[in-house]
């Protein structure tokens, strides 16, 4: 499912116009992104948690040349599914 399909599904499920649903979906994405950028967590009971995980700097290799490459430290978004979501997918 891509973003347009998600907007259509939200519009149908919630009885909204596609424009209103697109605004709602964009708002959710913006809030999640802003919270994670500020290193916050978003915990949605029964659905899952969005968190930020820190990856330490490490050494890598260029597969073509074999030269050693420094890979800088960075923060990466992480999603951990909740029990309700796991049960829904497996049930």
Curated annotation (Swiss-Prot):
Keywords: DNA condensation, DNA-binding. GO terms for biological process: chromosome condensation. Residues 57-91 are annotated as: Disordered. Pfam families: Bac_DNA_binding. GO terms for molecular function: DNA binding; structural constituent of chromatin. This is DNA-binding protein HRL53. Histone-like DNA-binding protein which is capable of wrapping DNA to stabilize it, and thus to prevent its denaturation under extreme environmental conditions. Binds to nod promoters and induces DNA binding. InterPro entries: Hist_DNA-bd, Histone-like_DNA-bd_CS, IHF-like_DNA-bd_dom_sf. It comes from the Bacteria. Belongs to the bacterial histone-like protein family.
């Amino acid at each position: 499912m891509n973003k347009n399909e998600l907007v259509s599904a939200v519009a149908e499920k919630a009885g909204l116009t596609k424009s209103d649903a697109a605004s709602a979906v964009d708002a959710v994405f913006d809030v999640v992104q802003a919270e994670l950028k500020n290193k916050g967590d978003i915990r949605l009971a029964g659905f899952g948690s969005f968190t930020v995980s820190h990856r330490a700097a490490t050494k890598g290799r260029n597969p073509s040349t074999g030269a050693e490459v420094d890979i800088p430290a960075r923060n990466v978004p992480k999603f951990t599914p909740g029990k309700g979501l796991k049960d829904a997918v497996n049930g």
